[in-house]
């Protein structure tokens, strides 16, 4: 459980940094339709047990963040405002809804203005998951965060998608497009 909290904390740190990097998020709004389609980069992890697709402008940043664990993978765009973090951790043997609620509480303790968009159970191609979507604010900027929790074998999958929230509908659509490509075997 400590590892999950540590990795979620790292994810929140990345999300917070993306939200407060003082860059003009309007400069990244080029190619809006192509950007929202998550068909650019196919990703396979765990010897093909986990796969998904990312927008073409997102590249693998794993190993470039200093203290990188083998079970954590990071992709981002050139600005760092869009990021996807995938963490494979030990199965905590707790219900996914309980873990998502705990994550929501941790986010709220860091950002009292946190807006929870949804915290719901979902099913992706036969696999039960929990989805926590929220909007965080830092230094006048906002970020849309979608966190997916689920079990892959005997491990806990945590996938965090962080996008600029200038256009919440676009951010939500982009996150959903990535989530809908998720395949667990």
Curated annotation (Swiss-Prot):
Q: Where is the lipid attached (S-diacylglycerol cysteine)?
A: 20
Q: What happens when the gene is disrupted?
A: Disruption of the gene leads to phage C1 adsorption defect. Mutation does not impair vitamin B12 utilization. Mutant is resistant to phage C6. Null mutant is not viable when grown at low temperatures, conditions which impact membrane fluidity. Cells lacking both yciB and dcrB display pleiotropic defects, including morphological changes, elevated amounts of lipopolysaccharide, membrane vesiculation, reduced proton motive force, accumulation of outer membrane proteins at the inner membrane, and dynamic shrinking and extension of the cytoplasmic membrane accompanied by lysis and cell death.
UniProt topology in membrane: Lipid-anchor
Q: Where in the cell is it found?
A: Cell membrane
Q: What does this protein do?
A: Plays a role in cell envelope biogenesis, maintenance of cell envelope integrity and membrane homeostasis. Essential for lipoprotein maturation under conditions where membrane fluidity may be altered. (Microbial infection) Involved in phage C1 and phage C6 infection. Participates in phage DNA transport pathways in cooperation with different outer membrane receptors, including FhuA and BtuB. Is probably required in the second stage of phage adsorption, the DNA injection process. Participates in the formation or opening of diffusion channels through the outer membrane after phage adsorption. DcrB probably only increases the efficiency of SdaC/DcrA action.
Please state which protein family the record places this protein in: Belongs to the DcrB family.
Which terms in the GO cellular component ontology are assigned? periplasmic space; plasma membrane
Q: Principal place where this protein is found?
A: membrane
Q: Name one Pfam family in it.
A: DcrB
Presence of the UniProt keyword Magnesium in the record: no
Its protein name is Inner membrane lipoprotein DcrB
Q: Which InterPro entries match?
A: DcrB, DcrB/EagT6
Gene from which this protein is expressed: dcrB
Lipid positions (N-palmitoyl cysteine) = 20
Q: Which domain of life is it from?
A: Bacteria
């Amino acid at each position: 459980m400590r590892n999950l909290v540590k990795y979620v904390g790292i994810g929140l740190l990345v999300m917070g940094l993306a939200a407060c990097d003082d860059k003009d998020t309007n400069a990244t709004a080029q190619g809006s339709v192509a950007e929202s389609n998550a068909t650019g980069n196919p990703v396979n992890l765990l010897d093909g047990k986990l796969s998904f697709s990312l927008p073409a402008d997102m590249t693998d940043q794993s190993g470039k963040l200093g203290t990188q664990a083998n079970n954590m993978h990071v992709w981002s765009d050139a600005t760092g405002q869009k990021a996807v973090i995938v963490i494979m951790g030990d199965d905590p043997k707790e219900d996914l809804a309980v873990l998502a609620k705990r994550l929501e509480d941790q986010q709220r303790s860091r950002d009292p203005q946190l807006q929870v968009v949804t915290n719901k159970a979902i099913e992706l191609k036969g696999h039960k998951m929990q989805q926590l979507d929220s909007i965080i604010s830092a230094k006048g900027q906002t970020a849309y965060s979608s966190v997916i929790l689920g079990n892959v074998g005997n491990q806990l999958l945590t996938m965090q998608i962080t996008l600029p929230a200038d256009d919440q509908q676009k951010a939500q659509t982009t996150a959903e497009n990535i989530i809908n490509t998720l395949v667990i075997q």
